[in-house]
Amino acid sequence: MKNINNKILKIFILFLAICSVKSDTCPTDSNWRPTPASSNSPVSPALPTTSLASDIVYGGNDLYYMAYWSMTDPNNLQPVSDVESEFSIALPAWAPDYFLIVAKQSAPALKANTNYQFSFDFKLGQVLTQGITYSNMTLSFYKPGDIDYLLWSYRAPMYSFTFTGDFSSTTYKSKTITFSVPVDLGLSTLILQVNRSRAMDYDDTTIFYKNMKITVPSKPVVAPPNLITKDSELINIPKASVSLDPQDLSTCPYLASDLVHWHNPSTWSNNLVPQPNENITIPAGKRVLISPCSISQTAIYQRIVIPATSELIFADSNLTMNVKDILVQGKFIMGTTKCRYNANINIIFHGSKTKVDTIAPFYGSKGIAVSAGGFISVHGKQYHNSWTKLASTVWSGDRIIYVQDNINWEVGQQVLITTSQFKDEIDNQNEVLTIKSILGKAIEFTTPIKFYHYGGKEYQAEVALLSRRIIFQGNDESDQDSFGGHVLVSGEGQFAGIQLKKMGQRNVKARYPLHFHLANVVQKSYISDCVVTKSYYRCYTIHGTNNLTLTRNVAFDVNGHCYYLEDGVEMDNTLSYNLAAFVHTIGEPAAGGAQTGETYYENENLTQPADSAAGGFYITNAYNTIIGNSASGGWAGFSFPNLEKPIGNHKNVEMEPQAFTTKVFEGNTAHSSGYQWISGSSIYVGGKLITDEVTGLLVYNTGRHSRPTCKDGIFSYDSSTYLWMRFNNTKVYLSNLGLGHWGDRVEVVGLEAYDSMRPASLFGAAWLSNAIVDGTGNILSKSQSYNRQGFQFYDTYVTTILSHITFRNFIQNPTSVYPDDDNVVIIALTFSDLYKPQFISSTINITLENILPAQIIGHKIVPDSGSSRFFNFIDWDGSLVGTHVPTIVGSHEKWWSYDDSKCTYNNDWTIWVCQKGSKSVGNIEFWVPNLIIRGEQNEGDSFVGSVSLFGDGITDVRKTAITRNAGITGITSTGWMLWLDGGSPTYLQVWAAQVAYQQYIFLAIPYPPGTTFTISTENKWAWQNAYGFNCTLASSAAEVRSSNGTKYYFDQTHLFVKIVNPVLTGSPAESFNRGGAKIDDVYWEYIYHINATNPNVSPNQDGFYTNLSYTLPSSTL
């Protein structure tokens, strides 16, 4: 009993001591404040003078096994010990005489002529019998794309080294070799080939490895001599202000004299400080200050409500709060614009996955919600710049990097270096490292850098700070269900200098890390220099909110679209100087056909089906200011989906989001994306998102959809309202198709594109100007077997002008079979007979650097393809093809050679090159009953005749085939003779689709003697057939050719008609004009009707005069 009483007494004394300490450290006096945290950074050690040697270690989880004879079994290689990276390889009986140990991840980048070491410990599991020995091993580095073929066909390694050693012991023996590669190896896969003296017999055996590693040698630390100071050669990428936000510590909110302490019982109506397990409501009309000693920093607070007349203000002192829910109807203050906090404040959100709204109705659970009329202000210490770029290239094993911009980062903080690899999601080479020391723009890390990160003059990997002093995070259990915390603001909110990690709730709408939700037009809200890491669902969301600013933020390792404009009504927001990196699709990434894409439907595992194509910036309404942002990775870096109507909460709003053009898109960068779909791009204007009218669920298709951008976002057929989506000063690199635009109108002015399949794929009325397009530079990129082109001209009904562009480094690919497999500047799209090019492409002021003449144009000859036969463009100054005069470029057929003195055939390009002179390129369509039916689709080999040049001194046959698919393109102001194998028709229509002002087609058609004609024209969509006429008989073919198109003539062999379009006046509105080049419009529709009758000769039952002879009209016409 006495012992029990003593224990009680000791507990009581301890309780009094605790109370006394709390009273001393957390007074209730209204003037008392805890000491504010210091803004001082930890002292940095000096940078070293020597970079230590570093090891890249390979354990069992980093490797897999390959062998011949269908003996490849991943289970053959198993980890034994993580401590020493020990692994075993079980070799079954009858195993082949060698096998391969293959690294799962890319090898370190290796510098030429540097001595590296490869080492390991090796032992046998059993003594080998029957004279079998491990004779030698070969260390090799292969192109990653070759690995899958090694067992079936020869692939030359990029480097290999065979060595011998003691491989016969059942106890570990160490082996070290020194090797040096003759050329830089940026991207490769390490393979160790283990060779036996002969194949195994009937015994199962085991071998063991441990401590396998590549050692990068030590080296002196010397600052590179030519650090990058300008991140682009041609364009201007704007940057955030170099200065820190101004501070006035006299305004700090914790200094206000009317504050009451949370820990003071008198603050509360019942004179009791609330306990964590209670639902806590801040007293009405009070401004309550939380200090570290005010609350338990380990217990979990259930729910805190801040009423409309109340405020909850945090002291600037180190604090941890564990909480489930916070509802802000009044004000939540943790620093302000002029008083950024320096404390380490950690808010940890707790709660299991649920659909119950525990914060408040519609606000979900496990987070902070700010209702309409509420206000939240969270401001941590400003670290600036929040992200920058490398100032020099970083190699595997380096520990020090140099960056371009001034930074005030601190020792112990974490830093991201983004990938310099194309396929970001497949081969993750993003690296997160910890700062060991820092001096100016030089940063030393605690561990060596594993991968190569490019920092050349063309482009540079981004370097971002991932640490902040204020952290909002989900609890450790959040990983189990991808159900983290979330911050939702329906009022006004100001966030700066905070980190949000393990936030967002996967596939739960409106539960994102940081989210402005139906806040309408905000007046003083922003998100600045924050960072989101390891997000389960998005990063920063703007939903039903206008006039919000997101600037200088970072996001890394994010599931689903990251910077996310949700419903399509979000306008007049500003996204500036933000970085998104390593963004993941939800589920398998979207793929599908080249233009059709794939369709996804809303379901519980994909509540926003567009997340199948998740990217860094998702812009459902383009009318926003988007400046100086960068997107690394993702399905696309920037996505502009097409929405005919808003979705979600705004599905009944009368608006067409897709009709809005870009308000400002200036100085943005995207890389390492677009590769997951054949038509994918790093900046993607395409895809379609709708609400199914029957089910009410979202449906997303990734593919080609029109985007009719017009004034004020109001769709119209009136061309005076047309607006072009404009992309200024844009950079893409390590991309598939760079900037992809399926829409109706686009201008890309100021573009740098490097190491990409193509810089852009532009549809509609498109202008690409003031650009550098560089085929290859980064050694990671050089090691890939990509077939790159400077631009591919489309095959029908678009208009594309390329002006003021420098193309560089398109190096011949010796393995290419066809021109369009090669690295060439201009590539033709030649696969179809249904889709044939009119005059739709032009170039002007083109510069070529380090490009052989053979690599300038690639045109694949496809006999059954009209898009091959009619490929053409006009080089308005001859700068691309080297003629230095306006030049018509036409396909391989002599049909394009209108004059021997002005046309030459280029065998490398398989095209004709002709001086333009007064000629142009035009297009007409013949519509013939029972033969060529408008809109009908037929096979490419459905040949029905030909069209041939005549007159102007032409005596030989210069023709091209025509098929049952309508459409012929050729050089205008020349003679064209139509020949149909089945005879000439009693009736046909000729649509003068593209016969420009002052141009014509002198048409000849053979008919039997005695044929008479009635010929008229129809301006189909004009009032009372304006400009239509009836043709009259001329006295000669020459008179027809010199006429205004109202004459025809029949010489008893050929009918002659001059095809013109009298509607045209030469107005600039009749063509697409940009950069000094033009493309004539297609006119819908001016049609010639030709009726033929013959009293002496009867047509066949299909209406054709047969038994005609193929004879060209006179060459003197």
Curated annotation (Swiss-Prot):
InterPro entries referenced in this protein's UniProt entry, alphabetically: CEMIP_beta-hel_dom, G8_domain, G8_domain-comF-like
Subcellular localization, as worded in the UniProt entry: Secreted
One term under GO cellular component: extracellular region
Domain (G8) ranges: 266-392
Source taxon at top rank: Eukaryota
Keyword Mitochondrion found: no
A Pfam family hit: G8
Keyword terms, alphabetized: Glycoprotein, Repeat, Secreted, Signal
Residues modified by glycosylation: 136, 195, 279, 318, 547, 605, 728, 845, 1030, 1044, 1091, 1107
PbH1 repeat positions: 522-544, 545-567, 621-642
Major localization listed first in the record, in broad terms: secreted
Signal sequence bounds: 1-23
Family listed: Belongs to the comF family.
Record protein name field: Protein rliB
Taxonomic source organism: Dictyostelium discoideum (Social amoeba)
